[in-house]
């Protein structure tokens, strides 16, 4: 599958012109991650966005320790959720600049596009309309995730 199709299907390139989609594909790099490999680690400072388009990833997070750094517990990270193909990970760190909140590990052979933070920010800032459309699309994706999490929480609390 080509980069443009992946970006359109995941929603990041929705409502973009062909020229804008080309800008996005020009900075996207394809990567393959074998089972067990880490795409990003909890507490890392990186801000790249990944678009998973084949395979499954697991989100792992260490349990918190009162008054300690998030990774200071020494306990084994726990699985949080599984994301299927065409899912976006890393968007929160891109937006707020904070460290990664979870480790993302390939559960099988994973293929992903990577949008490097520095190049993405550069093209978003150089074309305000493009930047607006991209951020609007990213917000729509985040809203879907929050709504899904709210439903899961509601189902968990009221069952």
What spans do the regions from the language model cover?
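Cytosolic regulatory regions built on CNB/CRP/Popeye-like sensor folds
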Residues: 1-159
């Amino acid at each position: 599958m080509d980069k443009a199709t992946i970006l359109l299907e995941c929603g990041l390139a929705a409502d973009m012109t062909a020229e804008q989609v080309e800008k996005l594909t020009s900075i996207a790099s394809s990567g393959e991650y074998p089972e067990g490999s880490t795409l990003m680690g909890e507490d890392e400072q990186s801000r790249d966005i990944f678009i998973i388009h084949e395979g499954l990833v697991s989100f792992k997070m260490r349990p918190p320790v009162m008054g300690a750094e998030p990774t200071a517990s020494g306990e084994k990270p726990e699985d949080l959720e599984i994301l299927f193909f065409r899912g976006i990970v890393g968007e929160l760190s891109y937006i707020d600049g904070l460290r990664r909140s979870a480790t993302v590990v390939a559960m099988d052979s994973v293929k992903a596009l990577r949008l490097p933070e520095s190049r993405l920010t550069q093209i978003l800032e150089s074309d305000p309309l493009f930047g607006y459309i991209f951020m609007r699309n990213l917000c729509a994706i985040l809203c879907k995730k929050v709504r899904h999490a709210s439903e899961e929480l509601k189902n968990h609390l009221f069952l």
